[in-house]
Amino acid sequence: MARSICFFAVAILALMLFAAYDAEAATCKAECPTWDSVCINKKPCVACCKKAKFSDGHCSKILRRCLCTKECVFEKTEATQTETFTKDVNTLAEALLEADMMV
């Protein structure tokens, strides 16, 4: 009896963790549209991003671009699965390249 209660508690906890993980919003990145120089300092980059209606910003580590961030709201669009997969692969490739260069 004690084992089944323990198992049930662990199962409920695991379900709650998975539900919370899936509910977390993704972070979208885009270059600041008005930035035209090399990004060295984060403070002006954040100001540029806030002006462009983003929530935050930072300088990219490799190319020194001003990247703005905000929470993504994905809606069902008419994009095909191939287009979505291609965008995900490109984003992942950029992240891996940036991570490899910093190691």
UniProtKB/Swiss-Prot annotation:
Propeptide: 73-103
Record note on pH: Stable under extremes of pH.
Post-translational modification: When compared to other plant defensins, the petunia defensins have an additional fifth disulfide bond.
Signal peptide feature range: 1-25
GO CC terms: extracellular region; vacuole
Record localization: Secreted; Vacuole
Disulfide-bond pairs as recorded: C28-C72, C32-C48, C39-C59, C45-C66, C49-C68
Coiled-coil region list: none
Thermoactivity: Stable under extremes of temperature.
GO biological-process terms attached to the record: defense response to fungus; killing of cells of another organism
Keyword Secreted appears in the UniProt entry: yes
Keywords: Antimicrobial, Disulfide bond, Fungicide, Knottin, Plant defense, Secreted, Signal, Vacuole
Tissue spec: Petals.
Assigned protein family: Belongs to the DEFL family.
Role played: Plant defense peptide with antifungal activity against F.oxysporum and B.cinerea.
Domain-level remarks: The presence of a 'disulfide through disulfide knot' structurally defines this protein as a knottin.
Protein name (record): Floral defensin-like protein 1
